[in-house]
């Protein structure tokens, strides 16, 4: 996403314990996504002194229930059955960190209205998309067949893809990291 926007970047996975962060967090989805994004960026920042590091994270909720990435195909199918006919909330956050200091954060949410999904559709969808969608919190990739899950989408396209890109670009411009 950053490269497509003309922002040079390198991907470096962060070594953080997301399970512990999620278990001990007591705020809303936006604050949890922000905490996870910041923890990831801070962990990578420790390995890259002087560099600006971007971290991001996304969470999916239906009502008060939070969904994590499915552990296997059966769990992915169960998630899709739960999402069927529901409005799901996708919260994405981004954090900008330098030398271990969180300099800027932003969180945004989108509402995705899942159409009624038949078991036949779910199976054929997973036949075509598994295991790739297993790495996605909502078991979909909007830029692929996942778009067929929805009747309507309310929210920013980039937030749905996993990062509130436009606010991030503004933060990068404000710090002179990309041309204004």
Each language-model region and where it sits:
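N-terminal G-site helix/loop of the GST-like fold
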Residues: 1-13, 174-178
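Anionic-ligand binding patches
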Residues: 24-180
């Amino acid at each position: 996403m950053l490269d497509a926007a003309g922002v040079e970047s390198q991907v470096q996975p962060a070594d953080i314990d997301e399970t512990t962060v999620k278990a001990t967090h007591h705020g809303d989805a936006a604050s949890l996504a922000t905490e996870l994004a910041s923890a990831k960026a801070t962990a990578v920042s420790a390995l890259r002194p002087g560099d600006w590091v971007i971290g991001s994270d996304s969470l999916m909720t239906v009502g008060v229930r939070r969904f994590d990435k499915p552990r296997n195909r059966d769990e992915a199918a169960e998630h899709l059955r739960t999402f069927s006919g529901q409005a799901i909330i996708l919260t994405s956050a981004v954090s900008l960190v330098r030398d271990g200091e969180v300099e800027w954060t932003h969180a945004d949410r989108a509402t995705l209205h899942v159409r009624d999904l038949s078991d036949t559709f779910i199976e054929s969808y997973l036949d075509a998309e598994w295991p790739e969608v297993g790495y996605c919190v909502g078991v979909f990739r909007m830029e692929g067949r996942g778009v067929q899950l929805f009747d309507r989408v309310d929210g920013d396209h980039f937030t749905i893809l996993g990062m509130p890109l436009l606010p991030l670009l503004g933060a990068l411009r404000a710090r002179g990291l990309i041309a204004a």
